[in-house]
From Swiss-Prot:
MF (Gene Ontology): structural constituent of ribosome
Assigned keywords, A-Z: Ribonucleoprotein, Ribosomal protein
InterPro entries: Ribosomal_bL35, Ribosomal_bL35-like, Ribosomal_bL35_CS, Ribosomal_bL35_sf
NCBIfam families in the record: rpmI_bact
GO cellular component: cytosolic large ribosomal subunit
Family: Belongs to the bacterial ribosomal protein bL35 family.
Protein's UniProt keywords contain Nucleotide-binding: no
Protein name per its UniProtKB record: Large ribosomal subunit protein bL35
Top-level taxonomic group: Bacteria
Source organism: Allorhizobium ampelinum (strain ATCC BAA-846 / DSM 112012 / S4) (Agrobacterium vitis (strain S4))
Any GO BP annotation: translation
């Protein structure tokens, strides 16, 4: 059976660290920021580490061969 292909959309959105954690950009920052608190905007900057269960799903289903 051939190897499963990596999803191109996931390549752009996720990064796997050396320890196996999955990094992703914070959600909810596209529009409507005027009503958000400054704390939310500050904390949503940069990347976030996905929860362990979500990270495993991403790796298994979308990034089977890593990046």
């Amino acid at each position: 059976m051939p190897k499963m292909k990596t999803k191109s959309s996931a390549k752009k959105r996720f990064k796997i660290t050396a320890s196996g954690k999955v990094l992703a950009a914070a959600a909810g920052k596209r529009h409507g920021m005027i009503k958000r608190s400054n704390k939310f905007i500050r904390n949503a900057r940069g990347t976030m580490v996905l929860a362990e269960a979500d990270g495993k799903k991403v790796i298994k289903n979308y990034l089977p061969n890593g990046l």
